[in-house]
């Protein structure tokens, strides 16, 4: 779970590993370890990060998970902004979004031409690119499958930030193409039946749910770390 911070951060300030001693950074490292343990029997190459509805913090979580996985020196990680309707990764990492995922999928650019380095060692991003009229069709295309295969050849792990599950079909399409999914849940806000509907949507896609990430839980004094 990710505890609530008093002030919202913007841009690179959102990335927890840039604040190594923060509680949030340590929480994401714990989540990374839990994901690794949950998939110890499989070769986890791709993770989808999604939520039930908008506003639960999935993009924040995807960016921070990618950053903590990249901290492992042997892992070269790619974060893909597959939320083609409301992309944010370019703003988080302060990179341009002139070309990106959509350009690759329609054949106007190559993966090598669109991947961008971040200030974090071993972490690269593929932004969304221009907003297309047909996001679901692009994400379900043969070109998307081919791109994922190409990414596997160049990166140890790819993390996809997708739209919310109950808003559009995009997340279900991607969940079927990735090795596991993480469902971000906004603490104290998202209703249980909404989360269960999202879980059902993943199951209908034959997706593997790695776990749920409870975001912005109010921290009690007794829950601070002690040494």
From Swiss-Prot:
S-S pairs: none
Keywords tagged on the record: ATP-binding, Kinase, Nucleotide-binding, Transferase, Tyrosine-protein kinase
E.C. number(s) listed in UniProt: 2.7.10.2
CDD domains reported in the protein's UniProt record: BY-kinase
Highest taxon above the source species: Bacteria
The reaction(s) this protein catalyses: L-tyrosyl-[protein] + ATP = O-phospho-L-tyrosyl-[protein] + ADP + H(+)
Class of enzymatic activity (EC top level): transferase
Residue ranges crossing the lipid bilayer per the database entry: none
Any one GO molecular-function label of the UniProt entry: ATP binding
Family indicated by similarity: Belongs to the CpsD/CapB family.
Name of the protein this chain belongs to: Putative tyrosine-protein kinase YveL
Gene name tied to this protein: yveL
